[in-house]
Amino acid sequence: MRSASLISIVDDDESMREATEGLLRSLGYQAVAFSSAEEFLKSDSIDNTACLIADVQMPGLSGIDLQYSLSARGVQMPTIFITAFPEEGSRKRAMTAGAVGYLSKPFSEESLLKCLDSALGNSR
């Protein structure tokens, strides 16, 4: 059930962060948004997050650095990376870090849902 799935969104772009959070809530997901990787790492949401959506390029820790930091702490969660600057090298690094999806901004609702369904083990 979607309402049981907490999706954490980490993006320094306020409009993207709010739009993604609003979309997920409208689809029945619990969603919480953070403006930086550091803010997410300090939060109580880590242990409850079913899927992480993280911007690749952010000030401070990047989304990929966030994924490595979580792994170093022994925290494993499906991660979907989003980026306004799609580059093959970045995509490869994201997938190596364990990404279940890599989307270029702007992405479609359908693309995001497909990645989420895969991350959460849902079938459509």
Predicted regions and their residues:
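Active-site residues of response regulator receiver
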Residues: 52-55, 83
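Receiver (REC) domain active-site loop signature in two-component systems and cognate sites
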Residues: 58
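Alpha4 helix (beta4-alpha4-beta5 surface) of REC/receiver domains from two-component response regulators
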Residues: 65, 86-101
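Acidic, metal-coordinating helix/loop segments flanking the phosphotransfer/catalytic sites
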Residues: 33-51
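A short, hydrophobic beta-strand element within the central beta-sheet of small alpha/beta folds
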Residues: 76-86
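Two-component/phosphorelay signaling modules centered on CheY-like receiver
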Residues: 14-32, 119
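C-terminal output helix
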Residues: 89, 107-117
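Acidic catalytic/metal-coordinating carboxylates
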Residues: 35-36, 62-65
